[in-house]
Structures are given as structure tokens and as C-alpha cells.
Amino acid sequence: NTNAIEYDYSHPVPDFGFLKEELQDSTRHYSRTVIAMHARPGSEQFDNNVKDVFQLYIREFPSLQFCLNAHNHQFQVADLFDDGILYSGCSNIAKRNYLLFTLTPDGDTYEIIKF
């Protein structure tokens, strides 16, 4: 969860303990990573006091492909930290579209599916 305003700061949001456990879990063998979250860094609901630390943590995951968020309810793709990691935001269902991602051996692609 990256929606910090849902908590009274008694629990860290994002949960860095969870991220650390995921990074250190040697029983999981995966070659690529996609990070999904509600609110992305820079959002008014993200604890922006820790956005740089969050970015440092997620950069450690194996072959990070991209990050996906939905809080803004609009299509967005941005390199928020100028480090090559793209944050993709999707619309809400009222806008009658969604993102379809395809992961390939050479990277990833996405398309906006309208319905």
C-alpha cells in the first residue's frame, strides 16, 4: 500500500519491512519485476518524505520492468526520477479503458484497450 493518508503514521507507508523481506526471500526465483501500487511517488497520498528511499528500494528488485499505479485515474507514463524506471498510470473504469501489458524476452509493451 502506498496510500499514506489512510494511516496515522503509526505504520510506515510504504511498508519498507515488506519490501526488504521480498528482496531477501531467497526461496523466490523470478527474473523480472513489476511493481504495482495505488498512489505513485509525488502524489498527495504518497508520503513524499520517503519517495527517494522508496525508489532506492524498488531499484534493487531483479530486472524491474515498470511500476503501475491507478490513483490519478488517468493514463500517464513518466520517468519520475530520471533513472529509466517508468511509472504507468491507468484510467478508472468509468473512462471505459484499461491497460494491457505484454512482457517479452526483450522488454515490455502496453496498449490501451477501450470498451
Stretches with model-predicted labels:
Residues 3-82:
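His/acidic metal-ligating clusters that form di-metal
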Residues 75-115:
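Binuclear metal-dependent phosphoesterase catalytic core
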